[in-house]
From Swiss-Prot:
Gene that this sequence comes from: kreg-1
Keywords: Stress response
Function: Plays a role in the stress response to heavy metals such as copper, probably in a fos-1/kgb-1-dependent manner.
Disordered: region residues: 62-83
Knockout mutant characteristics: RNAi-mediated knockdown results in partial sensitivity to Cu(2+) ions with only 60% of animals reaching adulthood 4 days after egg laying.
The keyword Ubl conjugation appears for this protein: no
Organism: Caenorhabditis elegans
GO biological process, one term: stress response to copper ion
Induction pattern: By heavy metal stress conditions, in response to Cu(2+).
Protein name, UniProt field: Protein kreg-1
Tissue specificity note: Weakly expressed in the intestine, but expression is up-regulated in response to Cu(2+).
Length: 83
């Protein structure tokens, strides 16, 4: 019986364990959600995609952040102008 009850941790533990390894840092998890909510709909989709790569690259590698940062700024400006 104990095993069954303990099994409940399976889904919970897996869920909490998935974000850290994927993002690299637990602190990156909250920002992703915030961006999606703050982004909205049209802007949120594009921003979310860049944010994910930007955050992921920053966590995995620092130099990648610089490259994406420049690209992100350019895209953001273009998107803003179009809007």
């Amino acid at each position: 019986m104990s095993y069954y009850g303990n099994g409940g941790y399976n889904p919970y533990g897996a869920y909490g364990n998935v974000p850290p390894p994927v993002y690299g840092t637990p602190g990156l998890a909250p920002p992703t959600v915030h961006v999606h909510t703050d982004g909205g709909h049209h802007h949120g989709h594009h921003h979310h995609h860049h944010s994910f790569l930007h955050e992921l690259g920053h966590a995995l590698t620092g130099h990648h952040h610089h490259h994406h940062g420049h690209h992100f700024g350019h895209h953001h400006h273009h998107h803003h102008g179009h809007h």
